[in-house]
């Protein structure tokens, strides 16, 4: 426990806040254009081909974004909406594409958790 004199000299240090999604610039989502759509493999204990795309945002940032859900219609020059949210087993992937908005189609035949994948209510 510091003395009053030590606190007068030094003061308490504020914890440094590190922004986890700097490219969004305090916005909930950002629009961008796909520059490359490809698959990549996850870190050690997991095994899959994860669908990701490199996106050039409207503010000039170039980020890697994960495409969730089964199947997608994205290709180069597709306009996508990006939200925050990292993928734990893909290093460098700190953003998600929003399904069902702009050029990104919703997931077909999705019955549960539809709002997360831009799927309409089945008849």
From Swiss-Prot:
Identify the Pfam families for this entry. Answer: Ribosom_S12_S23 (PF00164)
- Superkingdom of the source species: Bacteria
UniProt keyword annotation of tRNA-binding present: yes
Q: Which UniProt keywords apply?
A: Ribonucleoprotein, Ribosomal protein, RNA-binding, rRNA-binding, tRNA-binding
For this UniProt entry, what's an example GO CC term? ribosome
Q: Which GO terms describe its molecular function?
A: rRNA binding; structural constituent of ribosome; tRNA binding
* Residues annotated as signal peptide: none
Q: Which CDD domains match?
A: Ribosomal_S12
Q: Does the keyword rRNA-binding apply?
A: yes
Ranges for the region named Disordered are 104-123
Q: Where is the composition biased (Basic residues)?
A: 113-123
GO BP annotations listed: translation
**Family in the record:** Belongs to the universal ribosomal protein uS12 family.
Family annotation (NCBIfam families) = rpsL_bact (TIGR00981)
Q: What does this protein do?
A: With S4 and S5 plays an important role in translational accuracy.
What PANTHER family does its record include? Answer: 30S RIBOSOMAL PROTEIN S12 FAMILY MEMBER
Q: What does the subunit section of this Swiss-Prot or TrEMBL entry state?
A: Part of the 30S ribosomal subunit. Contacts proteins S8 and S17. May interact with IF1 in the 30S initiation complex.
Q: What is this protein called?
A: Small ribosomal subunit protein uS12
Q: What organism does the UniProt record list as the source?
A: Neisseria meningitidis serogroup B (strain ATCC BAA-335 / MC58)
Classification of source organism: Bacteria, Pseudomonadati, Pseudomonadota, Betaproteobacteria, Neisseriales
Q: Which gene carries the instructions for this protein?
A: rpsL
């Amino acid at each position: 426990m510091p003395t009053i004199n030590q606190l007068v000299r030094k003061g308490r240090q504020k914890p440094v806040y590190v922004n986890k999604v700097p490219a969004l610039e305090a916005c909930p989502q950002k629009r961008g254009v796909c520059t490359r759509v490809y698959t990549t493999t996850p870190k050690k204990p997991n095994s899959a081909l994860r669908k990701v795309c490199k996106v050039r945002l409207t503010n000039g940032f170039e980020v890697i974004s994960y495409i969730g859900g089964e199947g997608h219609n994205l290709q180069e020059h597709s306009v996508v909406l990006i939200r925050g949210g990292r993928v734990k087993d893909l290093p460098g992937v700190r953003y998600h594409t929003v399904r069902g908005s702009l050029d990104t189609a919703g997931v077909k035949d999705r019955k549960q958790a539809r709002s997360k994948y831009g799927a309409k209510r089945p008849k």
